[in-house]
Amino acid sequence: LVDFIHSESRLKFPEYRAPGSDKWQQISWEEAFDRIAKHIKEDRDANFIEKNADGVTVNRWLSTGMLCASASSNETGYLTQKFTRALGMLAVDNQARV
C-alpha cells in the first residue's frame, strides 16, 4: 500500500475522458463528485424497484453494484455494506473474495 501511495504514476486529481475522445482532461474534485452523483441518481431513478409483482415492498436497485477493496478495515466494510444496502443495491462484493 505504501508503494501505491508514493508511486510517481499515482493520479492525484480526477480526470475525465469525453465519449469518443482519446484525451483525458483534469477536472476539479467538485465536478467529479457532481458527475458521479448525477449518474448514480439517474441510474437509481430509472431502475429502482419499490414493489414486486405481488405488491410487496422490496426497495431493490439491481442495475448497479459495489466492489469493495480487500485492504479496507472491518469497520470500513461494515459502513460500505450499510451504505450500499440503504441505497437498495443487492450486488455488493469484496475484492478479497475474487
Stretches with model-predicted labels:
Residues 1-98:
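N-terminal export/assembly segments and adjacent metallocofactor-ligating motifs
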